[in-house]
């Protein structure tokens, strides 16, 4: 059942065209305009006069939502591509796609089209961020804080580099020196 729904989803996202740079610029501006208006309400605590939109503002919000949805659906292939790379690390593919889509949504809301970057380049970081956060918070029985998980990742990378360079498993002292952190911190992580 899950395989067929995943296949249907993958088939559906494959039908959406990628956006041209001009479309990204136009839609990015619409989303920025929407975010500027809705942020005003958010900063006011979600209620009150700041949340009473004029008809023109309501139109800007509607156009922004449509542009946001189109940017998301046009870039879901990027999410799936990245999610597949993270398979087998503790979460199902569907969960990874969901978390990657949350990262993509954040990227759409934060994207500044005037900076000259393609949206997919910008979104790549946000999607990876969403996937890495999900893996660090959801893939273990005992949740390890994100900052500790990031240090563990750096420790593993340092260990691999030192093993490759020296041909031996590095000591705690060597790891601490290489990472420029106290030996006690390395021992806590190990």
Where are each of the predicted segments found?
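DNA major-groove recognition helix of helix-turn-helix
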Residues: 190
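Basic, amphipathic alpha-helical hairpins
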Residues: 162-166
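Helix-turn-helix DNA-binding helix
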Residues: 186-187
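Helix-turn-helix DNA-binding elements, focusing on the entry/boundary residues of the two helices
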Residues: 172
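Alpha-helical promoter-recognition and RNA polymerase-docking modules of transcription initiation factors
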Residues: 2-143, 150-161
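Alpha-helical residues within the helix-turn-helix
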Residues: 177
């Amino acid at each position: 059942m899950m395989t067929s729904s995943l296949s249907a989803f993958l088939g559906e996202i494959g039908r959406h065209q990628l956006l041209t740079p001009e479309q990204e610029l136009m839609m990015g501006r619409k989303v920025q305009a929407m975010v500027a208006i809705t942020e005003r309400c958010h900063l006011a605590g979600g209620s009150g006069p700041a949340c009473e939109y004029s008809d023109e503002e309501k139109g800007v919000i509607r156009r922004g939502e449509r542009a946001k949805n189109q940017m998301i659906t046009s870039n879901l292939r990027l999410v799936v591509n990245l999610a597949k790379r993270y398979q087998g690390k503790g979460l199902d593919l569907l969960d990874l796609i969901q978390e990657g889509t949350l990262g993509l949504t954040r990227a759409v809301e934060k994207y500044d089209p005037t900076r000259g970057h393609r949206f997919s380049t910008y979104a790549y970081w946000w999607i990876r961020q969403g996937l890495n956060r999900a893996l660090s918070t959801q893939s273990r029985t005992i949740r390890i804080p994100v900052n500790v998980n990031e240090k563990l990742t750096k420790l593993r990378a340092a260990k691999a580099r030192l093993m490759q360079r020296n041909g031996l498993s590095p000591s705690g002292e060597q790891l601490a020196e290489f990472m420029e952190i106290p030996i006690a911190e390395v021992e806590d992580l190990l």
